């Protein structure tokens, strides 16, 4: 753990740091978590005011490409790379899908020119209709309009991957809800055969709160061996648990956090032995998982990527810088009013009482005291 608290928290004003401390304390305490989430959602529902600005300054990189590039440049001074993520959700027409693609093409160009931006992110639902993905996931027949829409989705993915390969940039495909994820998985794996021959241009996200993900990870590895490509994988616990519970009772998900943790850690062990065909990116704030990753000589030698969300687990990120792993912050940006669903889901996903956030709160408290005594 780095002793230089200034290096970890120097991007925050004292007011913002105090808010972050209070938010972390209340969101991770079992007695105040639900009320805190409710209050945040109510306040953020109206994109204005002091609270909205504070949350934005902690968790968001900016509204425009220029703003997010400035944030990325600041992090790069400390040796931290960034994964840029256009956080707008809920668009549902072809014009907006094309706009999202064009925006990602610009991101790829920016990434090529900036060493600290090794990945760009695409969210499948920003490139096509959720309804069309759902029908494809269930292998249902498509009518003429849906077939045309699916063809455009495939074209958008292909264009982005081809552009990324020609520019030497990696593309990370975000996970979606289970209702549409099978179509995404099949499409992306098919395209890995073409684009991941020499390097992992494409990285697919697997969510290990799902009961079938270890089996699917093995299937992906076997296919990579058979078809001679690199399987790029981002390993996460998952961001849609509450929604999965609402939609299908959560039957596809593990019932407890402990089971999810075991699943995630089993994936770490599996991947560490198969770096001949797997190029991993581990996204986690979990102390146990991080210890497992850092203890693996093969993962360290393989120049594995490890990442945390912007505004969360800053002490973890700075600790990892000392270990030889390549370190990223997942940096969302976009118009604030359209990015709220993303922001709220990320806050809720990480509002858990854990050793990680208890430790973070102690460090925040220590830094606030240091500033108070030092007159900062």
UniProtKB/Swiss-Prot annotation:
Chain's gene name: carD
Keyword Flavoprotein (UniProt): no
Family: Belongs to the proline oxidase family.
Keywords assigned by UniProt, alphabetized: Antibiotic biosynthesis, Oxidoreductase
InterPro entries, per the entry: FAD-linked_oxidoreductase-like (IPR029041), Proline_DH_dom (IPR002872), Proline_oxidase (IPR015659)
Intrachain disulfide bonds: none
GO molecular function terms attached to this record: FAD binding; proline dehydrogenase activity
Organism of derivation: Pectobacterium carotovorum subsp. carotovorum (Erwinia carotovora subsp. carotovora)
This protein's record includes keyword Oxidoreductase: yes
Coiled coil segments of this chain: none
GO biological-process terms attached to the record: antibiotic biosynthetic process; proline catabolic process to glutamate
Protein name, UniProt field: Carbapenem antibiotics biosynthesis protein CarD
């Amino acid at each position: 753990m780095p002793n230089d608290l200034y290096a970890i928290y120097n991007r925050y004003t004292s007011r913002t740091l105090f808010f972050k401390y209070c938010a972390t304390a209340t969101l991770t305490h079992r007695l105040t978590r639900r009320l805190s989430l409710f209050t945040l959602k109510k306040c953020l529902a109206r994109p204005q005011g002091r609270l909205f600005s504070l949350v934005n300054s902690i968790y968001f990189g900016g509204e425009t490409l220029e703003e997010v590039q400035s944030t990325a440049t600041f992090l790069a001074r400390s040796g931290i790379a960034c994964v840029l993520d256009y956080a707008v959700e809920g668009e549902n027409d072809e014009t907006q899908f094309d706009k999202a693609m064009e925006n990602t093409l610009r991101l790829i160009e920016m990434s090529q020119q900036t060493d600290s931006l090794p990945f760009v992110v695409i969210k499948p639902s920003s490139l096509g209709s959720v309804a069309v993905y759902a029908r494809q996931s269930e292998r249902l027949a498509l009518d003429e309009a849906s077939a045309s829409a699916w063809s455009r989705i495939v074209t958008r993915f292909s264009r982005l991957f081809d552009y990324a390969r020609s520019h030497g940039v990696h593309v990370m495909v975000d996970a979606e809800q289970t209702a549409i994820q099978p179509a995404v998985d099949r499409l992306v794996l098919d395209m890995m055969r073409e684009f991941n021959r020499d390097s992992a241009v494409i990285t697919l996200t697997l969510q290990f709160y799902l009961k079938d993900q270890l089996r699917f990870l093995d299937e992906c590895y076997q296919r990579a061996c058979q078809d001679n490509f690199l399987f790029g994988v981002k390993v996460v616990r998952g961001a849609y648990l509450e929604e999965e519970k609402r939609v299908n009772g959560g039957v596809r998900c593990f019932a407890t956090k402990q089971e999810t943790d075991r699943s995630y850690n089993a994936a770490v062990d599996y991947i560490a032995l198969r770096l001949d065909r797997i190029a991993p990116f581990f996204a986690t704030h979990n102390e146990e998982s991080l210890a497992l990753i850092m203890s693996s000589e093969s993962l360290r030698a393989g120049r594995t990527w490890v990442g945390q969300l912007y505004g969360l687990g800053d002490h973890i990120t700075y600790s990892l810088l000392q270990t030889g792993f390549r370190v990223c912050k997942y940096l969302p940006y976009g118009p604030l009013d359209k990015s709220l669903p993303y922001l709220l889901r990320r806050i809720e996903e990480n509002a858990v009482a854990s050793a990680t956030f208890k430790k973070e709160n102690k460090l925040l408290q220590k830094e606030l005291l240091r500033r108070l005594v030092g007159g900062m």
